[in-house]
């Protein structure tokens, strides 16, 4: 630790600078500029200050702590509830040239001491930690000896009982930080938090004058559709939708384990590469399902809402909720799994009035471990209010995007005439989709990008370079996807970790012929250029 008491740097004249961070951004991730909000949060970490980032899913929150971790000499602790994702996150770090590890209940007891020993020896830049581990005496003993340069709290809304994913174990974070010999800067990150939840997070994490960045909640590449359909009609609709979207990866959410199994089995019978995912499955079965989906061996994952945050696959093209979520936060988290690569994606809510009874049942039987009876009642009342907002969204006759953004407190004056990219604004109805075959032919993403104002904005933002389209663009894109899958299987990583769909699209548009030209494609960093560059250049010939 340094004499200044800030674990994030050794001394003022040796602090990593923002220019160092920009160079690391290009080297590790292949991006030349920070995304909105990233610069201020990274600067705060480099200066040893606390920070709080509220940024949309897919906007690069993880880079906010990954870059400082790559520059600091110590260890960055990332507290995360996403145990099922940690192994993939560590693999992604390795692909980017950053040393990572994780510490959670999936590690065998005999392995845990070795992981901590290596961390003390300086083997890692980042360690992902489940919140439950923070109260483990052996981990606390390790932390007291470690050179911890930053504590990042991912999915920070989990600390608030007013948030949609309250996790009592998150309440231990502030105490853990206070036990450290020297307090490092603390960084809180979330994609969905109302003003009330943000205040709660700051207080419960005991953030000290944090640098705050709320970049907005809008995801202009996502198209929102609400269809009021009875349960039996939903499966018929889903079958038709998948028939018109062959090759697209997507997530289907269902409210119960039984319904998950039923939908997954039905899809498999129809030849769809689908997997079920829910808490009633064994750890091995869940891991297999998640791995198959991440590796593109399964195109559709049918899951209970417990899976809501547990996927980091960037090229999910659709999310379908077969039932009413308990809150707008929960719905936006789940819908936000779609289109993380910035490409157009669809978010469907299929619901009926009967879903409201199911939601009330879930709320009345909520688990509230560690809470008193009075606290539990407050949680239930809060959940009822959140459900009321969700019902209002489902029944809305005004712009769906505007309703979501207003709920999170964002200025919506720019949407006074509607977004042009939701079922209310573009006049979509169930009848337009349902037909004798189950669904009518829907516009393609490319067609929609040309005709819908919101999708057109996405396209204009994405295509900062002016490269004319080629007749064989889709053929070349599929060739690159096939190569990516082969390389990913060889490396034992999910395909999206090699390159995202957006990066492959950039290659297709630019048609680079040299390593230098390939490095100009957004998402191609030095590490990946050296590892995969030649193979992709050959495929582009």
Predicted regions and their residues:
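Accessory DNA-binding and partner-docking regions appended to nucleic-acid-acting proteins
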Residues: 1-21, 357-358, 363, 367-376, ...
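Helicase motor core with emphasis on the C-terminal RecA-like subdomain
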Residues: 10-15, 19-28, 32-36, 40-62, ...
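Short alpha-helical "packing" element that flanks the helix-turn-helix/winged-helix DNA-binding module
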Residues: 38-41, 390, 504
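Short alpha-helical segment immediately N-terminal to, or the first helix within
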Residues: 44, 321, 393, 506-507
């Amino acid at each position: 630790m340094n004499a200044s008491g800030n674990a994030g740097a050794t001394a003022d004249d040796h602090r990593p600078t923002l220019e160092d961070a920009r160079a690391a951004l290009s080297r590790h991730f292949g991006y030349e500029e920070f995304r909105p909000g990233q610069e201020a949060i990274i600067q705060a970490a480099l200066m040893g200050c606390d920070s709080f980032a509220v940024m949309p899913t897919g906007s690069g929150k993880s880079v906010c702590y990954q870059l400082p971790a790559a520059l600091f000499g110590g260890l960055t602790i990332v507290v995360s509830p996403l145990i099922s994702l940690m192994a993939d996150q560590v693999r992604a770090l390795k692909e980017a040239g950053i040393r990572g590890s994780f510490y959670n209940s999936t590690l065998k007891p005999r392995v845990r001491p070795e992981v901590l020993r290596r961390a003390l020896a300086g083997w890692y830049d980042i360690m992902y930690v489940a919140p439950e581990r923070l109260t483990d005496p052996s981990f606390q003993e390790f932390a007291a000896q470690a050179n911890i340069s930053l504590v990042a709290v991912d999915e920070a809304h989990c600390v608030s009982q007013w948030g949609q994913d309250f996790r009592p174990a998150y309440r231990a974070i502030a105490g853990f930080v206070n036990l450290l010999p020297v307090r490092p800067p603390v960084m809180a990150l979330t994609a969905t938090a109302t003003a009330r939840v943000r205040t709660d997070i700051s207080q419960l994490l005991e953030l000290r004058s944090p640098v705050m960045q709320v970049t907005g909640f809008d995801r202009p590449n996502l198209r929102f559709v609400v269809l009021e359909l009875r349960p039996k009609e939903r499966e018929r609709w889903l079958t038709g939708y998948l028939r018109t979207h062959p090759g697209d990866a997507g997530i289907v959410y269902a409210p119960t384990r039984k319904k998950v199994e039923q939908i997954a089995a039905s899809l498999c019978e129809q030849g769809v590469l689908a997997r079920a995912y829910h808490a009633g499955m064994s750890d091995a079965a869940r891991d297999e399902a998640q791995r198959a989906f991440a590796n593109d061996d399964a195109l559709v994952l049918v899951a209970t809402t417990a899976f809501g945050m547990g996927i980091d696959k960037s090229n999910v093209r659709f999310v379908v909720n077969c039932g009413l979520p308990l809150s707008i936060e929960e719905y936006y988290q789940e819908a936000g799994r779609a289109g993380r690569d910035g490409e157009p994606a669809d978010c469907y809510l299929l619901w009926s009035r009967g879903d409201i009874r199911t939601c009330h049942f879930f709320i009345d039987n909520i688990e509230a471990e560690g809470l008193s009876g009075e606290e539990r009642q407050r949680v239930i009342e809060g959940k009822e209010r959140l459900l009321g907002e969700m019902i209002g969204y489902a029944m809305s006759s005004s712009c769906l995007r505007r309703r979501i953004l207003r709920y999170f407190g964002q200025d919506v004056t720019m949407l006074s005439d509607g977004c042009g990219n939701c079922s209310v604004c573009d006049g979509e109805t169930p009848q337009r989709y349902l037909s004798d075959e189950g669904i009518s032919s829907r516009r393609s993403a490319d067609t929609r990008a040309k005709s819908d104002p919101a999708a057109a904005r996405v396209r204009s933002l994405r295509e900062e370079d002016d490269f004319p389209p080629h007749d064989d663009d889709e053929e070349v894109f599929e060739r690159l996807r096939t190569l990516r899958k082969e390389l990913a299987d060889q490396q034992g990583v999910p395909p999206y970790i090699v390159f995202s769909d957006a990066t492959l699209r950039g290659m297709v548009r630019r048609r680079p012929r040299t390593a230098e030209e390939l490095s100009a494609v957004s998402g191609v960093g030095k590490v990946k250029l050296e590892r995969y560059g030649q193979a992709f250049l050959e495929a582009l010939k």
